[in-house]
């Protein structure tokens, strides 16, 4: 996750396929409803497909840039070396069991992400349902959040939480950065 925060997004968005990319992101997020955990899932699945020799088709199917994933993997290895040097983990290899003892504990991983990104925490204030879009019966929602410095922040359009239909397990979210465009995301 840390490597993905410091580098570009591995998703490629071909013209006219924005909805398919959005659905691929949502599928890769699973039921985590987290952009951060989605990136961890992307890495785990990509590493599996690298071992199987099917990484190119995986990347093609999910609109991922394999070259960016390789760069992120390199960053991940560098982070692991630094953590090993500081004696935070027992091995310099990020895939070593001792470096992943709690990787299956989603609650702990969420707590670590929150602590690492603090004070970048937002509270969901309101969920506004929008009318049906794209001719389907699905309806997107506008999620309005409050952060420490802003009273009206909306989810970025690329967030996997945009397809959550306003169903959230928690009323709090963490974020890496805020962007101002026509709205604050």
Task: Tell where the protein language model's regions lie, with residue ranges.
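Second RecA-like catalytic domain
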Residues: 1-185
